[in-house]
């Protein structure tokens, strides 16, 4: 636990420096007491994945003294109304948690020039909009590499959610990571078309297992839990995409390859308080400590497998390994 908090503190410092911020903590915390911050989520904070870590980021912001609010399970068609509701309530900062919200957020933000918007996995940068890009492909690459190191059937599977850029990129990274380890491996990649059909994800995962997959890897928010459950029920291995997913697959889960977006949210908010927000879209991945390997749940994972995966993580962080997203 101590190491966990040391790592989190280090990540926040790295990201704060990425935003060009080194200002007095007392000033930031004093300023934060008068700030209202909202988070609009496409899914549920109970997903043990993307939305859960976003919410954890909001809690970090709350701990700095801000007044916070959040809205879960927001369809794109309702995002503009959610923005306007927070604007009417006097919110100063609005985080949009999904690439799916980009177009509606960019358009609606024009109505509220005094509100600062942060878009996740977006390429938009306007007067009152800043974006940072979580490197989902790196998470997928690590999942694929570990799956290839663990498989006994030479067949591994990735199940994504809605086929938006982050999930598509995660699937591309997964395939390239698996083939980085074993160019001859069989890789199955399929997206669900949604993030909340847990039963459908379980059925698809069981279909994968019937086709020879013995390591399952989800990147589907709430639906990821169905993939983990399928692994538990069929006796294959699973690599989680979020902390705590092992609770639904205690015998199947090997480890989580984590996207700890919470520290990115906190760093973005600190940049707002300091009034020093770079215009360019900032990458948030292995180099920034946002993508990392969690604690292993199984004691029988060979040390050489762990060492190989750590080496791949370092090569992603240094840029030695490049992922092709074309």
Task: Cite the ranges covered by each PLM segment.
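Alpha-helical transmembrane segments
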Residues: 12-19
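A residue-level marker of the well-folded mature domains of exported/periplasmic proteins
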Residues: 25-326
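C-terminal motif of bacterial Sec signal peptides marking the signal peptidase cleavage site
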Residues: 20-24
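Bacterial N-terminal signal peptides that target proteins for export
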Residues: 1-12
């Amino acid at each position: 636990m101590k190491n966990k908090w040391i790592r989190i503190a280090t990540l926040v410092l790295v990201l704060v420096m990425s935003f060009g911020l080194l200002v007095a903590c007392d000033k930031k915390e004093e300023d934060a007491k008068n700030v209202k911050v909202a988070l609009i989520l496409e899914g549920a904070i109970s997903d043990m994945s993307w939305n859960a870590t976003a919410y954890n980021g909001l809690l970090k912001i709350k701990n700095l003294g801000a007044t916070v609010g959040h809205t879960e399970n927001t369809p794109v068609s309702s995002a503009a109304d959610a923005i306007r509701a927070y604007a009417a309530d006097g919110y100063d900062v609005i985080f949009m948690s999904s690439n799916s919200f980009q177009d509606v957020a960019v358009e609606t933000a024009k109505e509220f020039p005094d509100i600062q918007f942060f878009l996740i996995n977006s390429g938009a940068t306007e007067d009152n909009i800043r974006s940072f890009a979580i490197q989902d492909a790196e998470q997928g690459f690590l999942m694929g590499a570990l799956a290839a190191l663990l498989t006994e059937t030479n067949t591994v599977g990735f199940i994504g959610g809605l086929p938006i850029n982050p999930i598509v990129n995660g699937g591309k990274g997964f395939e390239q990571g698996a083939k980085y380890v074993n160019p001859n491996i069989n890789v199955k990649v399929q997206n669900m078309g949604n993030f909340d059909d847990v039963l459908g994800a379980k059925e698809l995962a069981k279909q994968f297992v019937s086709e020879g997959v013995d390591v399952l890897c989800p990147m589907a928010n709430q639906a990821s839990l169905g993939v983990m459950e399928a692994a538990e029920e069929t006796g294959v291995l699973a690599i989680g995409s979020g902390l705590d997913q092992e609770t639904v697959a205690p015998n199947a889960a090997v480890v989580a390859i984590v996207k700890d977006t919470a520290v990115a949210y906190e760093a973005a908010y600190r940049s707002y308080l300091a009034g020093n927000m770079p215009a360019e879209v900032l990458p948030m991945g292995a180099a920034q400590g946002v993508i990392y390997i969690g604690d292993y749940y199984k004691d029988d994972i060979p040390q050489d497998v762990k060492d190989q995966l750590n080496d791949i993580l370092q090569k992603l962080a240094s840029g030695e390994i490049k992922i092709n997203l074309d």
